[in-house]
Amino acid sequence: MKVLQERIRQEGLILSDTVLKVDSFLNHQVDTELALQIGQEFKKLFGHQPITKVITIEASGIQFAMATAIALGVPFIYAKKKKAVTLSEAVYSAPVHSFTRQEDYLVSVSQKYLGPDDKVLIVDDFLATGAALVGLVDIVKEAGAALLGVGCVIEKSFQEGRSLLENRGIEVHALARIASMSPGEIHFIDNESSLEKIKESAGC
C-alpha cells in the first residue's frame, strides 16, 4: 500500500533496528481517512472469503478492525486484556507475551460473540514476533470457528511472526512490509518482493 509506505517514510520515527513509532497517524493519533483506506485494502485482499467476524486485540488494532468490518459489512470483536479470568465468565482466553512491555497477560473474548458458525478474519496494527496474533488464533480455534486469514497494517518481515503463522497454514497479508530499518532509513518489500530503500525525512 504505497500511501501507507509514504506516510511511514514521512512521519514514522525509527528509534532502532526493531522499534518504529507511528503514533502520529496510526496508533495514538489516528488519521481516520487512512484507517478507512486500510479497511478497503483488507476488503480487496480478503473480500472474496465468506467472513462473518473481524477480530483484534485492544487497543491499537481496534480502528483497523472496525474499518475492515465496515468495508466487509460484518461485526468486529476486540479481545480484552485481563490479568485474570474468573471461572464464572463464559469466555475464550489465551495467554499472550508482550515483548514491548515485557509482561504476560490473558486476552479474552466472550463466548456469546464467537462460535463454531463463524468465519473469522484477524486484523492487527503490527506483525512482528507474532505472539499476540497466535493468542487470537488460539481463541478462534477454541471457539471452533474457521480462521480465514490474518491482515496486518505493518509487518516487520525481519522477525519471525509471518513464518510462525504460515507454518500453521494461515494466509497472511500485510499492507506495508519492512525488510529492515535503522535510524534514518527503511527498506520496504514491495508487491513484487523486491526491496525499495526509502530515506526517512529529516526531523522525523
Question: Predicted regions span which residues?
Answer:
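Short His-Asn-centered micro-motif
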Residues: I57-E58, V123-D124, I154
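Conserved PRPP/pyrophosphate-binding segment of the phosphoribosyltransferase/PRPP-pathway fold
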Residues: L36-T100
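PRPP-dependent phosphoribosyltransferase catalytic core
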Residues: E6, T18, V137-C204
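Conserved G/P- and acidic residue-centered "switch" motifs that form tight phosphate/ATP-binding loops
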Residues: D125, G130
